Amino acid sequence: LDRSSAASDVYKRQVLDLPHSDACYVRAYPAAVAEAWVDGHIHAFAFFGAVPQSIVYDNDRCLVAKILPDGTRKRAALFSGFLSHYLIRDRYGRPGKGNDKGNVEGLVGYCRRNFMVPLPEFATWEAFNLWLEEQCRKRQQDVLRGEGETIGERLQRDLAEMRSLPASPFDACDQDTGRVSSQSLVRYKTNDYSVPVAFAHQDVWIRAYVHDVVIGCRGEVIARHPRCWDRDELIFNPIHYLPLLEQKLNAFDQAAPLQGWELPEEFATLRRLMEARMNRHGRREYVQVLRLLETFDLADLHAAVKQALQMGAIGFDAVKHLLLCRVEHRPPRLDLDCYPYLPRTTVDKTRPGSYMRLLSSDAEDAA
């Protein structure tokens, strides 16, 4: 297995080669870190549907913490746990000797020439890696020089000698702990990630995956963010700060966590109407509408806001009611007490004694 990158690349490639069949697996990552190494293994094993009994590695510092004088390797903690989970025998090439694993070194060049020229463009890492997997599948149809079978046919013999996948995959994440600051931020590496303001000054645990950072307090997950690979950045989730802004309404427009928060235009219309009708209380109700995002999806809340605007029901109670009706799949029925200017209808209850008249009429007709 090999990791490769070039000065012009904005990604890191991880390449796994099965030398007997020449089958390969290639995956791209934004950075060369231990969790990316392990995540690449997990996806490779899922791709082949089996686990190799042994793998030859580079002496990458993400995997090898130290090379001892007798040549044995002291593994990094995450990598050691991964090997124990899959029962893989790890072997290593000599430092600086790429020819110890010449097959995979040649495969890196093949992937660069055939998969990356011209350089493909994708909107997400997931789309990029799905495309790379498809290229690896197509390559299994090739017949290499000197061989009488396709790579895919030879791969079947490799798979017969490999181990079955375990019941559950390894959790490929870097684990850390931290403490929430007074600004409701948690530092991981060089960046700060927000958590709900209710958890200020509390100890938390952190699980950093390749593409996500998950933060929890005791047994509860309290925040999840896309992982930032830049340095000294603040990563906010505006929803985390809404309870505080509900109490400090004057700070709403200047709050840093809300800067750049793009909401559908109907939300701005709702806020304008609320503030025009209810002044300061209207702004508070608008924040309460936004706080519904703590529980519900933006798509559902957006639909409820649009429906409220169409009905002229401008208020938090109306939006919440319409949202609940949408989620519970029942027709909306607004509480008209909130709208005294609407016309009312009154339906009297029938008294049981009224039905006796029908019985007496039937008796007279029978006579």
Q: Which sequence ranges carry the predicted segments?
A:
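Two-metal-ion acidic nuclease core segments, chiefly of the RNase H-like superfamily
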Residues: G71-D90
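Active-site-proximal acidic segments at structured loop/helix or strand boundaries
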Residues: V108-R207
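Short conserved beta-strand segments at catalytic cores or DNA/RNA-binding microdomains
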Residues: K12-D22, V56, F82, A208
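Protein C-terminal end segments and domain termini
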Residues: V213-A367
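Single conserved hydrophobic/aromatic residue that forms the stacking wall/gate
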Residues: L1-Y11
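Acidic/histidine-rich, metal-coordinating catalytic segments
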Residues: V51-G71
